């Protein structure tokens, strides 16, 4: 007997759900409510390597969606200023995905000039977008809004209703809430215990023009006085944003700092800055009754380490797996809590391990006991099941912060 699903919200999470559902749940009737008047979030998204499999699972070729979405290859993450605000004393660090590859040293690039200034995309992948025989040793920088449109174009069975709804439409077996931070139809808003206080809750974002002298093939995250700043290079622009704590700095002061940083770097803005705010939270039970929250509807803590789109991807794939296997919603909620915990712990490490004390934000972000608990958590579970971030990524993070002694066995 065919079942029906109603997706409310035509955002990235909404269309990703529709596209994946068409491919993997062929017996279901699919309807999406896509209100054209509601703007999409995002200024440029950094992704995890798992996204490659995601596109392949929907039958969308890399050489198709990357060209349409102005995406570029991402080879890791560049961190700067997380240990000290003094550029003379700071030692910037690059974490690379190919540390997780068995043949890492056979694939090492000559030097930094290979991945700085967009040269890898130009030398290897610029024309063909061809990656034969490659493993998950790269990810992507994408325009999330463009990926939603690309998936929408591939959908053939999804009924589209261009309307904004205020109540759940009648007659569907399952509802997917993709309404973002508004979370209009989430039935159980009990927050998951984060076990710590997360301060960053706001962001100024503004795309800037590309610049071959400044653009990178890695996601650049630079710690600032009251949070951190990201740079995500696309083919047609660069996404920039300042993620900060509104408890420690005013919105106006944060904007001034953000614009000043852009000016000092020689960046030329496209349009006016936009401000976003949120309450760092994750819902304990994203699937309650017959409504499932997907994407930022299910939770949002911090855009650090490319977790935003991954959590959307995980929420959709785990939901399909749960239904196909005949599991109960409790199983889905339990799995999603674990996935969120993994991501949050890794994000937390950046603040807990930082040695910065130049502002109250960095002082408040520290908690020595939590730092020890974090490493205990890592030791306990890293060998028990697969993490979002593999051991190699944790080791690179420990190298940057010089914190291996926290989890090394004491003789």
Residue positions per predicted region:
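N-terminal Rossmann-like FAD-binding beta1-loop-alpha1 element of flavoenzymes
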Residues: 3-28
């Amino acid at each position: 007997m065919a079942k029906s699903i109603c997706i409310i919200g035509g955002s990235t999470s909404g269309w990703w759900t529709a596209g994946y559902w068409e491919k993997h749940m062929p017996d279901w009737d699919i309807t999406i409510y896509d209100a054209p008047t509601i703007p999409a979030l995002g200024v440029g998204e950094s992704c995890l390597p798992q996204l490659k499999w995601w596109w392949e699972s929907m039958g969308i070729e890399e050489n198709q969606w990357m060209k349409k979405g102005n995406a570029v290859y991402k080879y890791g993450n560049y961190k700067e200023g997380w240990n000290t605000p003094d550029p003379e004393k700071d030692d910037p660090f690059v974490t690379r995905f190919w540390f997780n590859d068995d043949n890492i040293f056979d694939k090492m690039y000559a030097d930094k000039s290979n991945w700085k200034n967009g040269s890898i995309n130009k030398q290897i992948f610029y024309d063909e977008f061809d990656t034969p025989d490659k493993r998950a040793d790269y990810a992507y920088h994408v325009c999330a809004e463009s990926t939603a449109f690309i998936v929408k174009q591939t959908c053939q069975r999804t009924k589209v209703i261009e309307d904004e709804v205020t109540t759940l439409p009648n007659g569907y077996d399952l509802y997917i809430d993709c309404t973002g931070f508004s979370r209009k139809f989430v039935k159980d808003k009990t927050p998951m215990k984060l076990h710590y206080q997360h301060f960053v809750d706001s962001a100024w974002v503004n795309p800037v023009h590309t610049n071959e002298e400044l653009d990178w093939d890695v996601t650049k995250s630079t710690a600032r006085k009251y949070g951190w700043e990201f740079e995500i290079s696309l083919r047609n622009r660069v996404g920039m944003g300042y993620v900060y704590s509104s408890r420690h700095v005013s919105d106006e002061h944060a904007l001034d700092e953000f614009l000043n940083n852009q000016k000092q770097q020689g960046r030329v803005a496209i349009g006016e800055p936009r401000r976003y705010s949120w309450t760092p939270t994750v819902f304990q039970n994203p699937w309650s009754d017959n409504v499932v929250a997907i994407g930022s509807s299910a939770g949002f803590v911090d855009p650090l380490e490319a977790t935003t789109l991954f959590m959307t991807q995980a929420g959709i794939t785990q939901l399909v797996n749960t239904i196909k296997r005949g599991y109960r919603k409790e199983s889905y909620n339990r799995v999603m809590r674990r996935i969120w915990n993994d991501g949050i712990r890794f994000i937390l490490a950046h603040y807990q391990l930082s040695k910065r004390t130049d502002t109250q934000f960095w002082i408040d972000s520290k908690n020595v006991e939590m730092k020890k608990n974090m490493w205990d958590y890592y030791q306990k579970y890293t060998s028990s099941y697969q993490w979002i971030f593999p051991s190699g990524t944790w080791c690179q993070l420990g190298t940057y912060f010089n914190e291996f002694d926290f989890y090394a066995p004491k003789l």
